[in-house]
Curated annotation (Swiss-Prot):
GO terms for cellular component: cytoplasm. Transmembrane segments: none annotated. Keywords: Cytoplasm, Methyltransferase, rRNA processing, S-adenosyl-L-methionine, Transferase. GO terms for molecular function: 23S rRNA (guanine(1835)-N(2))-methyltransferase activity; nucleic acid binding. Its EC number is 2.1.1.174. This is Ribosomal RNA large subunit methyltransferase G. InterPro entries: DNA_methylase_N6_adenine_CS, rRNA_m2G-MeTrfase_RlmG, RsmC/RlmG, SAM-dependent_MTases_sf, Small_mtfrase_dom. It comes from Shewanella baltica (strain OS185).
Length: 378
């Protein structure tokens, strides 16, 4: 893995967050390079700029390297992106006082004169981001969006036109392109919230746009709900909670328990919190954390059950480091005798990791694609 970023005279040292990861993953990609290269070649003045979907700070560090006083609004939905960007600014002796931080639900300032953006995997989320920009950007504002060349087509350019303004793509460089969109100055309304029922559990669920499983139970959650553990649980963590459906169901089954919802996505945590209220569950029993696994979970929280459906993607990268960290955090934070109860794709072989960490692992249920595993802290 290289940590040395070099584009058009800008030299940086950049690491992913957390830093202890596979050696084949780096903290930026060619789309970051292309976008920063385009900015430098345009000799852009240091105007108020939004940087959106900057994975670990390559863009904000690069722009700050060009001009440490360049006013930047950095928007991210991922806690790991926020933490990684902070660390990489420190690693390169770059100030943070030129940065304002925003989540994907915050209202952006109206003085923006430029937007630099990476194309996210989730196009519904992307449409939401463009719509939010349409509500604050004056006509004529440029939005530069970098992506893999294979991701750019006529349908994507139509998304720009429908939600923000006309767009065109650059020539390819390192298999990436930069789309230039010009705001038409017409504010669009945000999409209406979609709520859907899970009748077998008497639950009503809604998701914000960057939350997995838009309008139905995903298969992994369904098999998990069918195989929740039995016991006398008082403190439960829904780790990587998404819309919170697992934690909501455990609140029904164990009404005396405190349920702690944790996710790297701010939209996921907000969705879980809204769903808790929507289903009229006790306000004092639900606790919500936008966090990198259990890194900042209060020390007094000692769960006797952790539920987990680990992701194996971080942005565009396929990686098992998130699952490893979730399992390690569970082992560290569980009470003696506490249970880690997970669902995963069979091919990911999580049983090997759990056996290594906990010295025990039981297969609770399985089908052709998924397996439910349980390990106990002893």
């Amino acid at each position: 893995m290289t940590t040395q970023f070099s584009v058009a005279g800008v030299e940086l040292e950049l690491l992913r967050y957390p830093a202890q990861q596979e050696s084949n993953l780096q903290a930026w990609d060619a789309a970051d390079e292309h976008l920063l290269k385009s900015l430098i070649e345009s000799e852009q003045a240091a105007v108020p700029t939004a940087i959106i979907n900057d994975s670990f700070g390559a863009l904000s560090c690069g722009v700050s390297k060009l001009n440490p006083s360049w006013p930047l609004c950095v928007e991210t939905d991922a806690r790991t992106s926020f933490l990684g960007t902070e660390q990489n600014h420190g690693r390169n002796q770059l100030p943070l006082d030129n940065l304002q931080w925003f989540t994907s639900r915050d209202t952006l300032p109206e003085n923006l004169a430029l937007v630099l953006m990476k194309l996210p995997k989730n196009l519904s989320y992307f449409a939401h981001q463009l719509t939010r920009l349409s509500q604050v950007l004056p006509a004529g504002t440029r939005i530069l969006v970098a992506a893999k060349a294979k991701s750019i087509n006529g349908a994507l350019l139509d998304v720009f036109g429908n939600h923000l303004g006309p767009a065109s793509a650059s020539l390819a460089w390192k298999n990436t392109r930069v789309i230039t969109c010009v705001s038409d100055g017409k504010p669009r309304p945000l999409a209406k919230e979609v709520t859907w029922a899970v009748p077998e559990y008497q639950l009503e669920i809604s998701n914000l746009s960057n939350v997995f499983a838009a309008n139905k139970l995903d298969i992994g959650a369904r098999i998990m709900l069918e195989n929740l553990p039995k016991g006398d649980f008082k403190s439960i963590v829904d780790l990587g909670c998404g819309n919170g459906v697992l934690g909501l169901r455990t609140a029904q089954l164990f009404p005396e328990a405190d349920i702690h919802f944790i996710d790297d996505s701010e939209m996921a945590v907000a969705s879980a919190k809204a769903n808790w209220a929507r289903n009229q569950l006790p306000a004092d029993k639900g606790h919500f954390y936008w966090d990198d696994c259990m890194t900042h979970l209060p020390e007094e929280v000692q769960p006797d059950l952790v539920l987990c459906n680990p992701p194996f993607h971080q942005g565009e990268a396929i990686t098992d480091h998130i699952a490893w960290q979730m399992f390690l955090d569970a082992r560290r934070r569980l009470k003696d005798g506490g249970i880690l109860h997970i669902v995963g794709n069979r091919h990911l072989a999580y049983h090997v990791k759990l056996q290594r960490l906990f010295k025990n692992c039981t297969t609770v249920a399985s089908n052709g694609k998924f397996v439910i595993l349980q390990a106990q802290k002893k």
